[in-house]
Amino acid sequence: MVKLRLKRYGRKKRPFYRVIAIDSRCRRDGKALKELGFYDPIAGKTQLDVPNIIFYLKAGAQTSETVGNLLQKAKVFNQLSLLN
Protein backbone atom coordinates (compact mmCIF):
# COMPACT_ATOMS: atom_id res chain seq x y z
CA MET A 1 0.00 0.00 0.00
CA VAL A 2 1.22 3.49 -0.82
CA LYS A 3 1.26 6.11 1.93
CA LEU A 4 1.77 9.85 1.82
CA ARG A 5 4.02 10.78 4.71
CA LEU A 6 6.91 12.98 5.80
CA LYS A 7 10.61 12.34 5.28
CA ARG A 8 12.87 14.19 7.70
CA TYR A 9 15.74 16.38 6.57
CA GLY A 10 17.62 19.21 8.23
CA ARG A 11 19.98 19.25 11.14
CA LYS A 12 19.56 18.66 14.83
CA LYS A 13 16.79 20.83 16.33
CA ARG A 14 16.06 22.31 12.85
CA PRO A 15 13.76 19.82 11.13
CA PHE A 16 12.66 20.15 7.54
CA TYR A 17 10.34 17.63 5.93
CA ARG A 18 9.48 16.50 2.43
CA VAL A 19 6.04 15.13 1.66
CA ILE A 20 6.57 11.85 -0.18
CA ALA A 21 4.68 8.90 -1.60
CA ILE A 22 6.26 5.69 -0.32
CA ASP A 23 5.44 2.02 0.16
CA SER A 24 4.05 1.62 3.68
CA ARG A 25 6.52 -1.19 4.45
CA CYS A 26 9.56 1.04 3.87
CA ARG A 27 11.30 2.94 6.62
CA ARG A 28 10.67 6.64 7.19
CA ASP A 29 13.73 7.87 5.32
CA GLY A 30 13.70 5.13 2.69
CA LYS A 31 13.54 5.62 -1.05
CA ALA A 32 10.42 7.51 -2.07
CA LEU A 33 8.26 6.72 -5.07
CA LYS A 34 7.77 10.45 -5.63
CA GLU A 35 8.44 13.67 -3.74
CA LEU A 36 5.26 15.73 -3.55
CA GLY A 37 6.29 18.87 -1.68
CA PHE A 38 7.89 20.12 1.49
CA TYR A 39 6.98 21.36 4.96
CA ASP A 40 9.15 23.64 7.08
CA PRO A 41 7.67 23.85 10.60
CA ILE A 42 10.21 26.45 11.77
CA ALA A 43 9.40 28.97 9.02
CA GLY A 44 5.82 27.76 8.67
CA LYS A 45 6.17 27.21 4.92
CA THR A 46 4.46 24.50 2.95
CA GLN A 47 4.62 23.77 -0.76
CA LEU A 48 2.61 20.92 -2.27
CA ASP A 49 2.37 19.39 -5.74
CA VAL A 50 -1.43 19.21 -5.65
CA PRO A 51 -2.07 17.43 -9.00
CA ASN A 52 0.26 14.57 -8.08
CA ILE A 53 -1.16 14.36 -4.55
CA ILE A 54 -4.67 14.08 -5.98
CA PHE A 55 -3.44 11.39 -8.38
CA TYR A 56 -2.08 9.29 -5.50
CA LEU A 57 -5.18 9.82 -3.35
CA LYS A 58 -7.43 8.70 -6.22
CA ALA A 59 -5.23 5.63 -6.66
CA GLY A 60 -5.93 4.67 -3.04
CA ALA A 61 -2.97 6.09 -1.14
CA GLN A 62 -3.41 6.63 2.59
CA THR A 63 -2.07 9.67 4.42
CA SER A 64 -0.29 9.85 7.72
CA GLU A 65 -2.01 11.95 10.38
CA THR A 66 0.36 14.89 9.94
CA VAL A 67 0.21 14.88 6.15
CA GLY A 68 -3.58 14.67 6.38
CA ASN A 69 -3.58 17.81 8.53
CA LEU A 70 -1.31 19.60 6.04
CA LEU A 71 -3.61 18.63 3.17
CA GLN A 72 -6.65 19.89 5.08
CA LYS A 73 -4.97 23.25 5.68
CA ALA A 74 -4.11 23.47 1.97
CA LYS A 75 -7.71 22.48 1.10
CA VAL A 76 -6.57 19.61 -1.10
CA PHE A 77 -9.46 17.41 0.05
CA ASN A 78 -11.91 20.10 -1.10
CA GLN A 79 -10.34 20.05 -4.56
CA LEU A 80 -10.48 16.26 -4.57
CA SER A 81 -14.20 16.24 -3.77
CA LEU A 82 -14.90 18.80 -6.50
CA LEU A 83 -13.22 16.56 -9.08
CA ASN A 84 -15.43 13.57 -8.25
From Swiss-Prot:
It is found in: Plastid, Chloroplast. This is Small ribosomal subunit protein bS16c. One of its GO terms (cellular component) is mitochondrion. InterPro entries: Ribosomal_bS16, Ribosomal_bS16_CS, Ribosomal_bS16_dom_sf. The lineage of its organism: Eukaryota, Viridiplantae, Streptophyta, Mesostigmatophyceae, Mesostigmatales. PROSITE patterns: RIBOSOMAL_S16. GO terms for biological process: mitochondrial translation. Belongs to the bacterial ribosomal protein bS16 family. Gene3D superfamilies: 3.30.1320.10. Its main location: plastid. Keywords: Chloroplast, Plastid, Ribonucleoprotein, Ribosomal protein. It comes from the Eukaryota. GO terms for molecular function: structural constituent of ribosome.
